Amino acid sequence: MLLKKIFLTGIIVLDLVFFVSYGFAARLKDIASISGVRENQLIGYGLVVGLAGTGDDVKNGFTSESLSNLLNRQGISMKNKTLKADNIAAVMVTSSLPAFAKIGARIDATVSSIGDAKSLHGGTLLMTPLRGVDGEIYAVAQGPVTLGGYAVGGANSSTGKNHASAGRVSSGVLVERELKYDFDRLRSFTLNLLQPDFTTSACLADVMNKTLGQHVEAKQVDSFSVDVRMKEATGGNLMNIISMMENLDVPVDSKSVVVMNEKTGTVVMGENVRISTVAVAHGNLSIQIKEDIRVSQPLPFSPLSSKGNQPAMDKKTGTIVAPGGQTVVTLDTTVGIEEEKKQVMVISKGVTIQEVVKALNALGVSPRDLITIMQTIKAAGALQAELKII
């Protein structure tokens, strides 16, 4: 009876250790993808028409030449004629073809001006073939362009909001060619993690073998990939097995990372970030140098200054009347120094991110100051996380 209790206690302890090590669980479809099953990039060159005088300058040769070629294909000859239209813009059209998109399916596209058009507001994208990396046409884009901003102006002033030289064509791309995936003869495939991690990939293979072991055999390759092989005795449909596989809950682990954007002052930290015992004192030293221009004007009726090194003399009496005076421009320089008074804050070993933020907020630091502090803590060897600056 005593041995039984000890054995059960050991199982409970091991289970708790397993749970703490792996953290939370996520669906397999959210953390991994099948190798080779992916989107494909498409690109094309087109024209946007219907702009209210905000299109490309007529001096842009590629825009006028594109319009001329378009009209020629419509049976309108533009030889020896000058095009003067500012309601047209040359654009690049980009889109992503989903892995299993069928002929006739509709997807979105991004339209970006490549000329000097001020705005694509109110424009319509004319039929534009979209090609893949192999040069083949996979889709055709056409439709009204929608923007998230505007740009208007007159001869001497203008105003705008967000970015008006790029927009979207919602559901304006018609798929004309499919990408073939032969799953009927597939007996093995590879799962690639979206965030490579040795612990997660090992756990993924373990969960698949325990849950779907009668159908598949999973083997960890590295921190990025897990090979999956269909067993000979598997009589079920591969699509059904993949469907069950996608909904498996996999314990996910990740390394501690602190991401900082110096351009915007944004700092993002995961909950696993730990800091060793360190003392932090942060204060800003501001030095301001100001120069004012002043004019020194002599008193009224004072004698003029003499030339050379001789003092000024009264011509009638021969009396020395001082050096004389003249108008002089001088600089009045003022130097001011202001230093913030901050106390030293001691951060204990192994604190969580919540405690770190609370301690730094107590110092009154801003997000941009936090970037400098985290870099300094990392340099001191107290930050137990990877530091990424973007």
Curated annotation (Swiss-Prot):
It is found in: Periplasm; Bacterial flagellum basal body. This is Flagellar P-ring protein. Assembles around the rod to form the L-ring and probably protects the motor/basal body from shearing forces during rotation. PANTHER family: FLAGELLAR P-RING PERIPLASMIC PROTEIN FLGI (PTHR30381), FLAGELLAR P-RING PROTEIN (PTHR30381:SF0). GO terms for molecular function: structural molecule activity. It comes from the Bacteria. The gene is flgI. GO terms for cellular component: bacterial-type flagellum basal body, distal rod, P ring; outer membrane-bounded periplasmic space. The basal body constitutes a major portion of the flagellar organelle and consists of four rings (L,P,S, and M) mounted on a central rod. Belongs to the FlgI family. It comes from Syntrophus aciditrophicus (strain SB). Keywords: Bacterial flagellum, Periplasm, Signal. Residues 1-25 form the signal peptide.
